[in-house]
């Protein structure tokens, strides 16, 4: 969750009232924040606020928090009103950017009076929105420039990698390629554009570079100080809806500082738009739904009043229906439940009387979990040690290192690391990885795991099913197929289940020393001696025998 710093005095200046630290601890709850830390520096009190909502970037700065609190306290109500004036600024977007970084939206904000606190909040908000909402600048990157140094019209264009400009914080020109290699921000975010045929560049009519989205601003225009009065805001990314929202968050925060927002015309190859668009969004809600889910006997007028304290404009359509309008810097309203949450925040969770749940039954353990625990106890009784490995894995671990062809598995869309890019289909690779990481320990090593494997199942709503499995691996000199079968025999005998082993072929096991495990004629697992190639892949120097079975067919 985003955390950000604010000065107590700055918050109070924006709210228009002073409060004690203890009072602030309660007030920030209206802005879906918690007071994480308090400290004093240079005679000022500072707060570290911990936002509890990743879908509300408008609440990640002093301006947004103060605005929310003003409304919650009744100092203002209904929709916030921001006057947006026309300007003659035009930005032209190059069609070559379509598959590089296609969307840019812009605004001008004039008449700012930025002190150190205001400037700090602007920079912090810019970074937090790009980091969290913008997924580390992949989907949203923000640039803010001294507009007095910019000569419109402006061009968002594709540039050759050999073009040069002076990046922020430097005094000498660098090529775009050099910026990716040498500049701190280039090394951090260069992967977002490095493999593209061109790099994005924002330049004015005189050819002066404003920025290289999403990497770095220029030293000429990209340094905003307390002397800056007028700014040009640039937001780029892949999703027009997301970049529009980010722009709205930034410009309305600046408007809270007294800035005057001006529109910019953005001309794309096949359409044009004017930004920012602060037109309120609309949604219909049911009063009865709000009463039912909240458990509160609120009248329609009371619900209307609570919503107006959360920056909604409410039009009652009937006894049970209302049309609500909410600010353009929000994009988190998708269901009446989202509106209900705001009703409860305004009402105050602490004002809701707790009730003891009326349960018709007594709680008890899940019988299948008891069965899994019994399996664990048996394995420990057989002299095995339990390990617990991660469900997240990779195709390399699941297939390549196990010497088998790649199959379809559940993959993560945007993994942080390729090592954790999929959900495992079977447990044995995890045990092999464990053995590989413990080759320095004494042998024999006898381990097992009871865990979930995730399989593709097109018949289900989620297209997947998670199946509980048992995997056993024995590592040490002298271990053979017989040793693994002895443990399997003992397990089945304790469970009172008859089973058969039928010879099969499997790339992870030695041919002729591998079999599929059958119960009632259905395959439930596999057993065998691990193939030498697999041992080599995992850098294991001793024989390994193993088996893996589904547990649900054994649950009687």
Swiss-Prot record:
Looking at the keywords, is NADP present?
Answer: no
Instruction: Fetch the SMART domains from UniProt.
Output: B3_4, B5
Oligomeric state and interaction partners are given as: Tetramer of two alpha and two beta subunits.
The record's listing under InterPro entries reads:
aa-tRNA-synth_II/BPL/LPL, B3/B4_tRNA-bd, DNA-bd_dom_put_sf, Phe-tRNA-ligase_IIc_bsu, Phe-tRNA-synth_IIc_bsu_arc_euk, Phe-tRNA_synthase-like_B3/B4, Phe_tRNA_ligase_beta2_arc, PheRS_beta_core
Instruction: Name the major location.
Output: cytoplasm
Q: Which domain of life is it from?
A: Archaea
Any one GO cellular component localisation term in the record: phenylalanine-tRNA ligase complex
Pfam families, A to Z: B3_4, B5, tRNA_synthFbeta
Entry EC no(s): 6.1.1.20
Which residue range or ranges hold the B5 domain?
A: 278-354
What is the name of this protein? Phenylalanine--tRNA ligase beta subunit
Extract the signal peptide range: none
Q: So which cofactors does this thing need? A: Mg(2+)
Name the UniProt key words of this record, in alphabetical order.
Answer: Aminoacyl-tRNA synthetase, ATP-binding, Cytoplasm, Ligase, Magnesium, Metal-binding, Nucleotide-binding, Protein biosynthesis
Q: PROSITE patterns given for it?
A: B5
A Gene Ontology biological process annotation? phenylalanyl-tRNA aminoacylation
Source organism per entry reads Pyrococcus furiosus (strain ATCC 43587 / DSM 3638 / JCM 8422 / Vc1)
Catalytic reactions on record:
tRNA(Phe) + L-phenylalanine + ATP = L-phenylalanyl-tRNA(Phe) + AMP + diphosphate + H(+)
